[in-house]
């Protein structure tokens, strides 16, 4: 459903020169699977998510979503995805119902079909109690549910969650993870980007560990623990990053010695 091959994104900076935000990243995600991208802030996770959602164009590499190329078929990609982040804008003057309805119209959904879909979503996400509440009076949890509903309104096969629990209280974050699990059970293809290790441990079928634009390793939790001979996932994560940084320093030392 999602295929990424040697994806690279480079920025030109007048003071620093070229900066590689994403460096030859490759992975695939199947329907009915939650694929976790785990990394610290600045690891390149959001850049990958934005390329997959067609907001950014890759410098090199290939990415397809539901069989559509993110460059050549950008409009089709957008029809097949829903995107949820921690900073999705909510309109202060529109109610929860009006906002989700508006996005359904943007996707060209017929009126009767859209109304049925909204009724289903508002029941599924327990939003009926604030369906007429304007954005300016919503709690953080309410706003996040609206973000999820408008990402799901057109029933896309692929859903992307980019640091979606950031800034949420424990209860709201827990409810969001429950929604993600339900989406997996319904056969959706899901990417879940986070810097919180406990979330990927509890939620994701497979995990890719990112650092400085690269995927250092990927696999199931069992595979990663076996490969690195470490049961403590936090120790595994930081050990992998530490070894990668040491290798980079050794490489730089060798280059400096040659020059």
What are these regions (language model features)?
Residues 134-138:
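Conserved ABC ATPase signature
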Residues 218-219:
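ABC ATPase "signature
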Residues 155:
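Conserved catalytic motifs of ABC-family nucleotide-binding domains
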Residues 101, 105, 112-130, 178:
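Conserved ABC ATPase "signature" region
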Residues 1-4, 10-24, 31, 73-74:
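A short, flexible loop at the N-terminus of ABC-type nucleotide-binding domains that lies
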Residues 159-163:
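Catalytic Walker B motif of ABC-type/P-loop ATPase nucleotide-binding domains
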């Amino acid at each position: 459903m999602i295929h990424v091959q040697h994806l690279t994104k480079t920025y030109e900076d007048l003071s620093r020169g070229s900066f590689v935000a994403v460096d030859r990243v490759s992975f695939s995600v199947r329907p009915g699977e939650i694929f976790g991208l785990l990394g610290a802030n600045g690891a390149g996770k959001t850049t990958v998510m934005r390329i997959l959602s067609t907001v950014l164009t890759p410098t090199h590499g290939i990415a397809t979503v539901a069989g559509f190329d993110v460059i050549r078929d950008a409009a089709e990609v957008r029809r097949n995805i829903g995107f949820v982040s921690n900073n999705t804008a909510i309109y202060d003057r529109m109610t929860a119902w009006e906002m989700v309805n508006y996005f359904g119209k943007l996707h060209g959904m017929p009126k009767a079909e859209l109304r049925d879909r909204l009724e289903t979503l508002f029941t599924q996400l327990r939003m009926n109690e604030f369906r007429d509440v304007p954005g300016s009076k919503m709690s953080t949890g309410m706003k996040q549910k609206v973000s999820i509903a408008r990402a799901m309104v057109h029933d896309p096969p692929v859903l992307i969650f980019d640091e979606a629990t950031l800034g949420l209280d424990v209860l709201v974050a827990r409810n969001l993870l429950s929604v993600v699990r339900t989406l997996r059970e319904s056969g959706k293809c899901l990417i879940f980007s986070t810097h919180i290790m406990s979330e990927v441990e509890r939620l994701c079928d497979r995990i890719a560990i990112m650092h400085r634009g690269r995927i250092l390793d990927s696999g199931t939790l069992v595979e990663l623990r076996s490969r690195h001979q470490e049961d403590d996932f936090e120790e595994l994560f930081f050990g992998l990053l530490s070894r990668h940084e040491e290798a980079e320093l050794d490489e730089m030392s060798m280059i400096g010695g040659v020059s």
